[in-house]
Amino acid sequence: TEADDNEVKRRTGAASAWIRQAFEEARQTNARGIFILFHANPGFEFVKGSHARLGFDEIIELLENESAQYSKPILLAHGDSHRFRVDKPLRSHSNQTINHVTRVETFGSSNVHWIRIAVDPLSDEVFSIQKQIIKKNR
């Protein structure tokens, strides 16, 4: 519906402004890294323009563009599809992996465990990820 389309535009605009502000502040303060946490899986693994990425193409493109201008470690964390994974989801305009960007997706309702994110600004990687398995939930 038109109302749904308007809501997507409003949310995308707000998220985009927030992401731009986060990267700008990181550049101005010479931050050692950026950690962005969000709920939904934006569909990094799907083809641009596909239905699975509906409403997220603009956000992913913004993350790719901002990451190209900020070479320090970036951690993107989310849930939603509820399958633990750690990967390098972003690509440059020349389709090269953006290696300083890592995505971690947390466990979900059918597989309840948790993830510990440690931050060490003195480390080259800045962020470390440890899955925490709850024995009784195996």
Language model feature labels by segment:
Residues 83-138:
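Binuclear metal-dependent phosphoesterase catalytic core
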Residues 2-90:
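His/acidic metal-ligating clusters that form di-metal
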